[in-house]
Each structure stands twice: as structure tokens, then as C-alpha cells.
């Protein structure tokens, strides 16, 4: 029996501007691990010592992700757009907290959102 990775999405998901109208469809396809070569996912880093990482959604097909729990912060239209969104995320975090600790801010923000009942 194959286990699917557990993918959770940030309530205020960062999305490339060109994909705003397709966001729901892209998220649904990511949950089903459908191939979307142009989609890059921005996640909290698997190692807690790091903040964010991004990679092509095609990598979600690899067995290393079968038992992984991923918290997706953003979806981007390719590598360059992923770089841009990571910069935007860090700037937003710094503006809110005067710190670059994106991991802590995003997890706390998500927990508060879930506490309010979505």
C-alpha cells in the first residue's frame, strides 16, 4: 500500500499573479500529485534549521515524498517566479515582525487562523 504525502496549504497562499484564477485547480491537482511541470511549490523547509524551500511540483512524484508532511506556502509559475515569491514572503514577514523568521511567523499565523475556525 502506498501512502500519499500529507499536503497542507497556508490559508493565505502566495500565488503567481498569472495563476490567481487557476489557484483552486492547481491546488486540487497538487493534492492528487498530478504532473504540473511549470508549477513550483514553496514550502516550509523539511529541516527546522532552515526557513523555506522551493522545488518543481514534479518532484512530489518521488518516493521520498510518500511519507512527508508538506506545508505549502506558495505556488509559482516556474523557477524565477518562485524566487520572486520567496522574496515577497520574507519581505511580508519582516514587515510584520521585524524578523526574517518566516517559519515561526507562518506557523503561528496558520495556527491562529485555524483556531478561529477557518
Could you describe each region identified by the protein language model?
Residues 1-30:
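Negatively charged, low-complexity tracts enriched in Asp/Glu with abundant Ser/Thr
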